[in-house]
Amino acid sequence: MVALTQIGAEFKIIATAHLKQIDRVLNGLTGSAHSLKEKSPHAITVGFAAVNYSEEWTGMEGTRSFPVKRTSARAQQESDETARRLRQVAGPAFDEFLLLTFRATNQEPFPFAWLNAAGIAADYGAALVRIADSYEKRF
């Protein structure tokens, strides 16, 4: 054995076309957690997923851009459903799973805001405490 993984993390961001991407993102997250556990059964697995609640987003692929607009109601509904599936399907695959919600457009001047900054900070801090506790117990 060359190395032993003690903590492994996977991070996925869904910025647009949420429901078109959800299966690929869920497979990536859960696959990463399972792969890590196969190789290092005692490893602490941490999953992060970020969901964009913005009505507008500009995707970039090389030199091409793809502007997307959703109604406010559509953005809310699609983002809520994406967040629900992430928690329900990906969450249980990890020892710790943190869902981050934000608004960003990927358009100048590149505005960004957490939906609930205080709540995200509290959830992140609590996750770090639990991870540290798990680390002390496992290693």
Role assignments for model-derived ranges:
Residues 1, 5-15, 29:
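Conserved catalytic cores of phosphodiester-cleaving nucleases, focusing on short active-site segments
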Residues 22-39, 85:
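Short, charged, amphipathic alpha-helix that recurs within catalytic cores of restriction-modification
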Residues 8, 46-49, 99:
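Structural beta-sheet core signal
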